[in-house]
Regions:
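GIY-YIG nuclease catalytic motif and its immediate N-terminal context
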Residues: 1
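C-terminal alpha-helical interaction modules of replication/initiation AAA+ assemblies
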Residues: 4-5, 9, 18-20, 35-225, ...
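Metallocofactor- and cofactor-centric catalytic cores in central/energy metabolism, strongly enriched
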Residues: 31
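Noncatalytic carbohydrate-binding groove/subsite architecture in carbohydrate-active enzymes
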Residues: 231
Length: 331
């Protein structure tokens, strides 16, 4: 049952469902726990379909109402949702663990500080596009990971230079010794008087595709990740929107990269980030038929990544181990 049809029904207590969900959201914004719990319990007792919609509303509130005030809010609510459905069947008159789960989620959301600026940011991006101002590909997007960068002679070595593709802002301490070691391993290969050109057999079919506004999709992918690394939030949001309107395949790619970046680029800068981003990725599947909600999840995930301290030590350690194996230093 889609959201429009759901909102035409009445709750067990006689309230219009659409009005009930609107009231619930406003209660969360105001931090009115008792009213929020009362409304939610009425929805819960109405049907299992309403319980499912209730969780979607709570997840939406975690993203759009709480927002950046508590980046882990969605992960917390998602975890309670999993507990709700993994502990017992729907028994509205008995209450039980299902009721405990959403009541706890509501108490948490009502207690959180609120930062509901996501809608404003999405509107700003859309207004820019309507005015003919679209996302752009910066020069730093071209590196050894893509065709354009390899044609310019970029290598894994210059990727590690201070203004290379691996630059992160703000940078947390911890990665520098690993960067130094990897540069030592790569310099004899790609540096010096006779540097070896970098070759790659990897094929990215996005190389032959363009976004609705004419951006090469392979470079758009690269620009998206590197703009987040440099905490260029507005640029990253523009790129995310351009990718989103390019179709489901690009949307899926962005989510894959977001989860990877939470480990690869954020690392020990914010160890909880991978848990946050995994929850975002899982929750977006609940909104397969609701593009507006999926866009909101995507844009908020980008904002969280941009705001996190970044520490690429994990990726650098992996690179060291791989290169040592290639050099024969490891059996």
């Amino acid at each position: 049952m889609d959201r429009i049809k759901i909102t035409e029904y009445k709750t067990r207590g006689g309230m219009n469902v659409g009005a009930a969900f609107e009231k619930l959201y406003n209660n969360i914004l105001k931090g009115d726990t008792d009213e929020a719990v009362s409304t939610a319990f009425d929805l819960y007792r109405t049907s299992s379909v309403m319980l499912e919609e209730l969780w979607k509303q709570l997840e939406t509130a975690a993203v759009c109402a709480v927002g950046l005030a508590e980046p882990g809010a969605l992960a917390y609510v998602y975890n309670l949702r999993c507990i709700c459905y993994h502990t017992e069947p729907y028994m509205p008159d008995a209450g039980g663990m299902q009721a405990l789960s959403f009541i706890q989620a509501l108490r948490y959301l009502c207690a959180c500080e609120k930062e509901p600026s996501l809608e404003t940011e999405i509107k700003r991006v859309r207004d820019s596009c309507q005015a003919g101002v679209y996302a752009e590909i910066p020069d730093f997007a071209k590196d050894h990971h893509n065709h354009a960068g390899r044609e310019l002679g970029h290598t894994p070595l210059d990727f590690l230079y201070p203004d290379g593709g691996s630059r992160v802002v703000p940078e947390a301490e911890g990665a520098e010794p690993y960067k130094k070691r990897l540069i030592e391993l790569l310099t004899p290969i790609y540096g010096g008087e006779h540097p070896r050109p970098f070759r790659s057999d990897a094929y990215n079919h996005f190389y032959e595709m363009e976004s609705p506004h004419g951006l090469n999709l392979e470079l758009l992918q690269s620009a998206f990740q590197k703009s987040i690394r440099r905490a260029l939030e507005r640029e990253a949001l523009m790129l995310a929107y351009e990718a989103f309107i390019s179709g489901s395949e690009m949307e899926a790619y962005l989510w894959e990269r977001i989860v990877i970046m939470s480990v690869e680029d954020i690392g020990m800068g914010e160890p909880e980030c991978s848990r946050f981003m995994y929850a975002y990725c899982r929750v977006k599947d609940q909104f397969a038929d609701r593009p507006e909600e999926r866009l909101g999840l995507l844009m908020q995930a980008v904002r969280i990544l941009c705001s996190c301290p970044k520490e690429r030590g994990t990726e650098l350690i992996k690179g060291i181990l791989v290169q040592e194996c290639k050099n024969g230093d490891r059996k």
